[in-house]
């Protein structure tokens, strides 16, 4: 939500749209038509003082004005079924799909045209979204491989293979990444140039939802 508005990405085969609702009344504030499908959710970013709502879909990534629904920019770089939401850090948007790979897009300032900086076509997520922070991009896959890339260049920093796959997205607290696998095993590792496992607790049941961190607690939904 932003400035009293709740945003809903309603991408599907027919009657796709992006909607904004007034949080206080529940009334529609605006809506824009879309002609794409996806399984992803929007993210809200501060692009050099201008708030932008960023959506991924089966063909592209789009940036919208969250107050009006105006399309600000559009980059064709995706394909196939897209479940991963975008990630953002330091002026760069990271979007991925199994069919089209991961693209790092410099969205620049308010008048600049977005440009693709680099692509990654190796181990790619099925549903998990990338995590971007402090010059790193964490990319988990459904078959258990986790890659750490340099956010500026796309160079592989490290890669680690786990016994289980990941459908939920990684979350960050300080410099610690929390990533839960499909069988409920939590991998806790440090964000950095080398893989450093800090702990591996489990919840004892399958997990597909992304954990939420509030204060000093982490909330996990199992099956």
Task: Give residue spans per PLM region.
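Noncatalytic, solvent-exposed loop/strand surfaces
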Residues: 1-223
């Amino acid at each position: 939500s932003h400035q009293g508005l709740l945003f809903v990405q309603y991408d599907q085969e027919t009657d796709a749209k992006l909607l904004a609702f007034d949080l206080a009344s529940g009334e529609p504030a605006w809506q824009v038509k879309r002609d794409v499908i996806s399984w992803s959710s929007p993210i809200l970013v501060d692009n050099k003082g201008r708030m932008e709502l960023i959506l991924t879909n089966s063909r592209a990534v789009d940036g919208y004005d969250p107050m009006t629904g105006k399309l600000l920019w559009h980059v064709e770089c995706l394909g196939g079924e897209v479940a991963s939401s975008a990630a953002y850090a330091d002026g760069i948007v990271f979007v991925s799909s199994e069919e089209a790979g991961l693209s790092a897009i410099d969205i620049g300032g308010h008048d600049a045209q977005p440009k693709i900086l680099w692509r990654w076509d190796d181990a790619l997520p099925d549903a998990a979204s990338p995590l971007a922070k402090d010059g790193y991009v964490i990319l988990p896959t459904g078959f258990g491989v986790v890659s750490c890339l340099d956010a500026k260049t796309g160079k592989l920093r490290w890669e680690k293979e786990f016994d289980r796959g990941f459908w939920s997205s990684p979350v960050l607290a300080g410099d610690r990444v929390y990533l839960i696998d499909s069988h409920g095993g939590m991998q806790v590792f440090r964000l950095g140039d080398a893989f450093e496992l800090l702990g591996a607790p489990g919840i004892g049941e399958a997990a597909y939802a992304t954990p939420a961190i509030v204060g000093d607690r982490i909330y996990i939904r199992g099956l």
